[in-house]
Amino acid sequence: MDSLTIVPPALLIISILMAVAFLTALERKIMGHMQLRKGPNIVGPLGLLQPFADGLKLITKELTLPLLATPTLFILAPTAALMLALAMWSPLPMPSPLADLNLGLLLLLAMSSLMVYSFLWSGWSSNSKYALMGAMRAVAQTISYEVTLAIIVLSIVLLSGGFSLHTLTVTQEPLYLALATWPSMMMWYTSTLAETNRAPFDLTEGESELVSGFNVEYSASPFALFFLAEYANIMLMNTLTTTLFLSPSTPTFLPALFTIALMSKALLLTMSFLWVRASYPRFRYDQLMHLLWKNFLPMTLTLCLWHSSVPMSMFGLPPMT
């Protein structure tokens, strides 16, 4: 293998991990200000080095395995979670994707579905009833909300004319799809909150019920891997939301401007994730499921039929001259 072929993926991975580190600092700062306190402000200027101190602490701690755990799956689950979270960035145009695929959207949906295996493995291999119940909740929640995500993606494909993420950037040169499909965007954004197990849908870690959920038995570096995977998924989902609904136009002469515009919009969406966490209480589990199956599913199916039927009905009209 040519050594130059390793450089772009390595740069992408390092950039994602650095972004995750500063995202955790940003979250703690925003949560602090919303709760009328300062947040981290000791380690480094303005507390910016706090994530690196936390990471160093977790890496240097001793790895402890529960006595009755299944060691192979126990270690494999967080590793698989982080590997999948990093691999899902490959088809995203920023501005040039690492893997320019014709079915990039389908690949992202398929790989996000594989994340449930890491949740299930971690809960089952921990041999703890709290971890297993948290894993079952996470799996049910993730699989359920992927139904809505898939239907909304189908609606976007009908409007853009292709499964390629590059096609979406070309389609949105004259007009953002968010303006034409704002109900779908609102449901997509809410579904990404549930897909990433974020508040107010963080049912996997109810402190009074399941303590920390599927990762309750984890500590040291495996816990850090789960933590990195969670925040990498948050940034990925918001970057995908930007590409689907708010994509900058195709870069022609300054690709750096495309990247800056894309990541600025993704950062604003990510900050609204943190705003939602500070503002809303946790849903009950039955409310979470009713929201999807009784509200989002009928609405997304109706919008999908609307997006497919309106263009076909226009074909029968006489030419507008």
Swiss-Prot record:
GO cellular component, one term: mitochondrial inner membrane
One GO-annotated biological process of the protein: aerobic respiration
Primary location class: mitochondrion
Catalytic reaction equation(s): a ubiquinone + NADH + 5 H(+)(in) = a ubiquinol + NAD(+) + 4 H(+)(out)
Subcellular localization(s) per the UniProt record: Mitochondrion inner membrane
Transmembrane segments: 6-26, 67-87, 103-123, 143-163, 174-194, 220-240, 256-276, 296-316
EC number: 7.1.1.2
Keyword Transmembrane belongs to the record: yes
Keywords: Electron transport, Membrane, Mitochondrion, Mitochondrion inner membrane, NAD, Respiratory chain, Translocase, Transmembrane, Transmembrane helix, Transport, Ubiquinone
GO molecular function annotations of the record: NADH dehydrogenase (ubiquinone) activity
Membrane topology: Multi-pass membrane protein
InterPro entries assigned: NADH_UbQ_OxRdtase_su1/FPO, NADH_UbQ_OxRdtase_su1_CS
Family: Belongs to the complex I subunit 1 family.
HAMAP family in alphabetical order: NDH1_NuoH
Role summary: Core subunit of the mitochondrial membrane respiratory chain NADH dehydrogenase (Complex I) that is believed to belong to the minimal assembly required for catalysis. Complex I functions in the transfer of electrons from NADH to the respiratory chain. The immediate electron acceptor for the enzyme is believed to be ubiquinone.
Annotated protein name in UniProt: NADH-ubiquinone oxidoreductase chain 1
Organism: Alligator mississippiensis (American alligator)
Lineage per the UniProt record: Eukaryota, Metazoa, Chordata, Craniata, Vertebrata
Gene designation: MT-ND1
